[in-house]
């Protein structure tokens, strides 16, 4: 019986780990679970999509589940969230976010590559409708919908890391102050 490797997370680290696992073991059954709609997208390109420099959001998609299946023989499940890890049973519990069903999957090796989680500021107003966090393509779509409205003239960015600085440039391209 061949090893089963489960990868939790399907963006940069998860897809890279899954592809590496395939190179290390051609016979292993490899299953990748991603709770979002997309795998392997260019997260650093999100500000350029918001600015309009990247016009088509599909340009942000580096790989598709179909590509991974065909090229690497890796089963990819998007909109599937691992809700529980049962180390004693060597199983994960996975929820299909579209269907609402749950299923347990056995593993021999488990790779956790879930990435970072943006922290909402614990201040009054942080949950207002025009307060955004940028982590994925869906977030970028929501920000873009907000900033293209003609009444939007100003933006505030909290965070001065690379993405924050690129967002400042993106808003500038859009004519925002």
Pin down the residues of each PLM region.
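Glycine-/small-residue-rich active-site loops that bind phosphorylated ligands and cofactors
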Residues: 13, 38, 84, 99, ...
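FAD-binding core/adjacent interface of flavoenzyme oxidoreductases
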Residues: 1-6, 66-158, 177
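Generic non-transmembrane alpha-helix signal with a bias for helix starts/N-cap capping motifs
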Residues: 61-62, 140, 164
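Conserved phosphate-binding and hydrolysis motifs of nucleotide-dependent enzymes
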Residues: 9-14, 115, 159-164
